[in-house]
Amino acid sequence: MATYIMGDLHGCFTEFQQLLDKISYNPNYDELWLTGDIVARGEHSLACLRFIKDPKNNIKTVLGNHDLHLLATLVGIKKVKPTDKLEALFSAPDRLELQHWLRKQPLMVQHPTHNFLLVHAGISPEWDLSTTLSCAREAEMILQSDNYADYLAEMYDNTPDQWQDNLTGIARWRYILNAFTRMRFCYADKRLDFSCKLPIEKAPVTLKPWLELDNPLYDTHDILFGHWASLMGKTSRSNIYALDTGCVWGNHLTIINWETKQIFRQERLK
């Protein structure tokens, strides 16, 4: 049995299947975990969702920002962008089934055997493990509740940018979502920044990648994340793995065998 973790799919279903063939993935013995952003920008988001949802494929995922945005469009909060290439999903007969399955997926996972932490964008530099786990479960309960659409309507904001234990309501929920699904850079005082999308070497000196800030959790646990394609799999910490390598942008899809730490890649098919 092998445990695999794969970076952001963004609707790249053909490359997804090619990579599974390359590693001889067997769902009867192996398990596959995904960093989220299953959908948007690529041509085959619907096929990706259906394949991942099918229990016989033994695949689990965390939610990414594009997955959350899809939920917001499905409930009518946002309009579909043509660049997201989601038209087939909106006319699919199983649209509602996929919608309700998606909103029941976790924001963060601690693997039951290997103990690694899996998340889409990152873990707040202000959280210990207990806070990370409790915040994930708290936000997931809202997504799985009957009034989840009311909360989705309020997620499109960059504030608050700093964690406080006494945050409540929408502000608390929004910080949790932004940390798990949108974070890249932070200030030295651990405030989150959402304006900079430059490569690390071109970013202002006042900003640092979240994983380079001081947080004991970053030293004690293996963390796997996606979201940040411009890192191209490179981080400053040997125990923190960046798995989004920009397949949808013409680069490649990446998967790691956790037991052996072997990396496999599938180039974008033109």
From Swiss-Prot:
A molecular function GO annotation: bis(5'-nucleosyl)-tetraphosphatase (symmetrical) activity
Claim: Disulfide bond is one of the keywords in the record: no
First-tier enzyme category under EC: hydrolase
Matches recorded under SUPFAM superfamilies: Metallo-dependent phosphatases
UniProt keyword annotation of Hydrolase present: yes
Keyword terms: Hydrolase
Job description of the protein: Hydrolyzes diadenosine 5',5'''-P1,P4-tetraphosphate to yield ADP.
Name the record gives this protein: Bis(5'-nucleosyl)-tetraphosphatase, symmetrical
Organism of this sequence: Haemophilus ducreyi (strain 35000HP / ATCC 700724)
